[in-house]
Amino acid sequence: MIGRLKGILIEKQPPYLLLDVNGVGYELQAPMTTFYRLPSLGHEVVLHTHLSITENLHQLFGFAEQRDRSLFRTLIKVNGVGPKLAVAILSGMESDDIARCVRDNNIKALTRVPGIGQKTAERLVIELRDRLKNWDLPQGDMLAHGEIQAIASDNDIYAEAESALIALGYKPVDAAKMVASAAKQKPEARSEELIRIALRSLAGV
């Protein structure tokens, strides 16, 4: 079982990243909340990992924080929630925000994540309520994301942001609208920050 990787970040195109660990390249999938915390290319990073093994597929997922990995592992135990949807959920809001939605029975916020309908959101709240009852929540409202790192050139900022949103499950036309709206709010934003703004606007936080 691979539980932690320390290496040089050599590629990142949400939701995928590539880590060079002693000459071996590890491809991982990660939620946007992890991408927000990544250093620029060529720098060292430590990621907490989860290896998902099925009959035909081995997937490695990376997380900047142990609590994000912990919540990911809790999410995939919910009936109907696989790794892809768990990544989408963790991309839409911080772990503490998800726990807060469960605590407050905030179905509406959860349904804004692509792939989560009313029934799935209700199931998440029901099944996670006991599992997250000891989650240490900070005081206050929905959390703000951390500092954002720039990853794209000026020519492909919008394209990268749209591609990332599409990979998270949004339709191309919706992704384009979300990026355009985010760009109006902050014209100088880089791709990762555009994604952050778009996702937070959709979640209403």
UniProtKB/Swiss-Prot annotation:
It is found in: Cytoplasm. Pfam families: HHH_5, RuvA_C, RuvA_N. GO terms for molecular function: ATP binding; four-way junction DNA binding; four-way junction helicase activity. Residues 153-205 are annotated as: Domain III. GO terms for cellular component: cytoplasm; Holliday junction helicase complex; Holliday junction resolvase complex. Its main location: cytoplasm. It comes from the Bacteria. Belongs to the RuvA family. The RuvA-RuvB-RuvC complex processes Holliday junction (HJ) DNA during genetic recombination and DNA repair, while the RuvA-RuvB complex plays an important role in the rescue of blocked DNA replication forks via replication fork reversal (RFR). RuvA specifically binds to HJ cruciform DNA, conferring on it an open structure. The RuvB hexamer acts as an ATP-dependent pump, pulling dsDNA into and through the RuvAB complex. HJ branch migration allows RuvC to scan DNA until it finds its consensus sequence, where it cleaves and resolves the cruciform DNA. Homotetramer. Forms an RuvA(8)-RuvB(12)-Holliday junction (HJ) complex. HJ DNA is sandwiched between 2 RuvA tetramers; dsDNA enters through RuvA and exits via RuvB. An RuvB hexamer assembles on each DNA strand where it exits the tetramer. Each RuvB hexamer is contacted by two RuvA subunits (via domain III) on 2 adjacent RuvB subunits; this complex drives branch migration. In the full resolvosome a probable DNA-RuvA(4)-RuvB(12)-RuvC(2) complex forms which resolves the HJ. This is Holliday junction branch migration complex subunit RuvA.
